[in-house]
Amino acid sequence: MKDKYGREIDYLRISLTDKCNLRCAYCMEKDHNDFIHNDKLMTLDEILRVVKECASIGIKKVRLTGGEPLVREGIVDLIKNINKIPEIEEICLTTNGILLGDKVKELSENGLKRVNISLDTLKEDRFKEITRIGTLDKVLYSIEKCLENNVKVKINTVILEDFNKDEILDLINLACENPIDLRFIELMPIGEGKKFKGVTNSEILEIIKKEKKVLSDGKTLRLNGPAKYISIEGFKGKIGFISAMSDCFCEDCNRIRVTPEGFMKQCLHWKYGINLRDKMRNGISDEELREIIKKSIYEKPEKHNFKMKEKDEDKRFMYEIGG
């Protein structure tokens, strides 16, 4: 269906949990352990009900996020049941990759088509520093197992000033040697991210162009989503740029988000939305739920305003919202 600005909304991002097995520095405080109580999370049945009603009004693609979605029990059955919904064409997962390698075969057999894996460095010491408790080898193993099981892979990378800027060329080589896409995501001022200085994608692109032969004269191509892509000579995959801060893509936004506790967010930046979990637990019918979702989608804000401090911005951390 379309929102009031005429954008076709066909993509649902639904967070299964705020819990995570890492403590990435720009996402979560090092000693954080105060997560949403299980009784406040949407149940798997409630999640499935939301997906079904969204599918009935035009949602075609579902992405499961977190926190780390793979720490949520029952995720395989959830994917299996979502895959049974006729209108859903694609099920995807965003993950840090730590737990994925040993689960990807079963997930794929039950309907998972794509994964986005967060990876900001190829140096073990830096990986430990940024994630605080992670092991790089497990992420690389997960990428390998995804390719073995024909699950399409995108790598999401955040470049931070004075941390991993010197690894840009090493990171893009992942897309040279493998049929995967690597996307640079500009750091957004959400939660712990406000404490760090990111690098703009225009600067990253210039670094790449100095060392690699970029096809199509270096022009970026936007496909279905916020990323703009370039092709590099000899590369099996593409390089993408998600430039939320320097190149607003809101006019093409096609998504709606649901947080772990069932709050349907109309925009990543703004706090506007409605709690679907509470409505369901108060006994509303499927038809009533569908109408609430339709109204929420229709009222999506025109654009974010991350560059300005606003009284109506969402103060929550990314892991609480759903990355």
Swiss-Prot record:
Record field: catalytic activity: GTP + AH2 + S-adenosyl-L-methionine = (8S)-3',8-cyclo-7,8-dihydroguanosine 5'-triphosphate + 5'-deoxyadenosine + L-methionine + A + H(+)
Functional pathway: Cofactor biosynthesis; molybdopterin biosynthesis
Lineage top rank: taxon: Bacteria
Pfam families named in the record: Fer4_12, Mob_synth_C, Radical_SAM
Enzyme Commission (EC) number: 4.1.99.22
Binding site for S-adenosyl-L-methionine: Y26, G67, S118, M188
Binding site for GTP: R13, R63, T94, K154, R255, I256, R257
Sample GO molecular function, one term: metal ion binding
Sites where the protein binds [4Fe-4S] cluster 1: C20, C24, C27
Cofactor note: Binds 2 [4Fe-4S] clusters. Binds 1 [4Fe-4S] cluster coordinated with 3 cysteines and an exchangeable S-adenosyl-L-methionine and 1 [4Fe-4S] cluster coordinated with 3 cysteines and the GTP-derived substrate.
Gene3D superfamilies: Aldolase class I
Binding annotation for [4Fe-4S] cluster 2: C250, C253, C267
Cross-referenced InterPro entries: Aldolase_TIM (IPR013785), Elp3/MiaA/NifB-like_rSAM (IPR006638), MoaA (IPR013483), MoaA_NifB_PqqE_Fe-S-bd_CS (IPR000385), MoaA_twitch (IPR010505), MoCo_biosynth_MoaA/MoaC (IPR050105), rSAM (IPR007197)
PANTHER family for the chain: MOLYBDENUM COFACTOR BIOSYNTHESIS PROTEIN 1, MOLYBDOPTERIN COFACTOR SYNTHESIS PROTEIN A
Family matches, as HAMAP family: MoaA_B
Protein name: GTP 3',8-cyclase
Protein's organism: Clostridium perfringens (strain 13 / Type A)
